[in-house]
């Protein structure tokens, strides 16, 4: 009985086809990996996790985790993906926190000019401990700049600005006028809704 079931498993594996998974154009259509499936439809909506280091070869970016969702077939055995979100590693965030300073978070839902909805979590770390009014003002800066950037950008441009530090730099330049800052990061993003094609 067991030999029959094991041969059935082997036969099922033989029937599966391997598909190559590629990143979106904004990440240079880099190879993300491969996945087996009987049918291409079985592979759709699977989520892939890589680090930015995996895509760029820059070890300094190993703490940035990227998430992609398989969209469909490009040609033959090649599958396309959409950026689904990112997150900074907990160890990296922990390494940034200092005593006698403030950690300020703001979560904001935004829509890009081409209709993609995302949830963005900004993180600001001050040099010294900030007052409540200063924290409130900094949260407003995070929200306002993030919304404005999204409204002015298409999805690919906004993702690029988030991942490669343009958005966090814009927030830093404005928020430092309120209180001395040590670091600004976009801690996490998640794609909430994509426009129907």
Curated annotation (Swiss-Prot):
Q: What GO cellular-component annotations does this UniProt entry give?
A: ribonucleoprotein complex; ribosome
What GO MF terms are annotated? structural constituent of ribosome
| Cystine pairs | none
Identify the InterPro entries for this entry.
Ribosomal_eS1, Ribosomal_eS1_arc
Which of UniProt's keywords are assigned here? Answer: Ribonucleoprotein, Ribosomal protein
The record's PANTHER family line, in alphabetical order, gives:
40S RIBOSOMAL PROTEIN S3A
What family does this chain come from, according to its entry? Belongs to the eukaryotic ribosomal protein eS1 family.
- Can you say what this protein is called? Small ribosomal subunit protein eS1
């Amino acid at each position: 009985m067991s030999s029959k079931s094991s041969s059935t498993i082997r036969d099922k594996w033989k029937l599966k086809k391997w598909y190559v998974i590629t990143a979106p154009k904004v990440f240079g259509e880099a190879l993300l990996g491969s996945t087996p499936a009987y049918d291409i439809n079985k592979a759709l909506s699977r989520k892939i996790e890589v680090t930015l280091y995996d895509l760029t070869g820059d070890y300094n970016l190993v703490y940035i985790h990227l998430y992609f969702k398989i969209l469909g077939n490009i040609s033959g055995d090649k599958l396309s993906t959409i950026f689904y979100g990112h997150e900074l590693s907990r160890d990296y965030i922990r390494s940034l926190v200092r005593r006698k300073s403030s950690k300020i978070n703001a979560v904001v839902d935004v829509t890009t000019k081409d209709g993609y909805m995302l949830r963005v979590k900004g993180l600001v770390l001050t040099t010294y401990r900030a007052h409540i009014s200063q924290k409130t003002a900094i949260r407003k800066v995070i929200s306002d700049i993030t919304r404005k950037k999204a409204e002015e950008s298409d999805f690919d441009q906004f993702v690029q600005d988030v991942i490669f530090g343009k958005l966090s730099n814009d927030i830093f330049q404005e928020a430092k006028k309120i209180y001395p800052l040590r670091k600004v990061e976009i801690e996490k993003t998640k794609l909430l809704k994509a426009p129907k094609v």
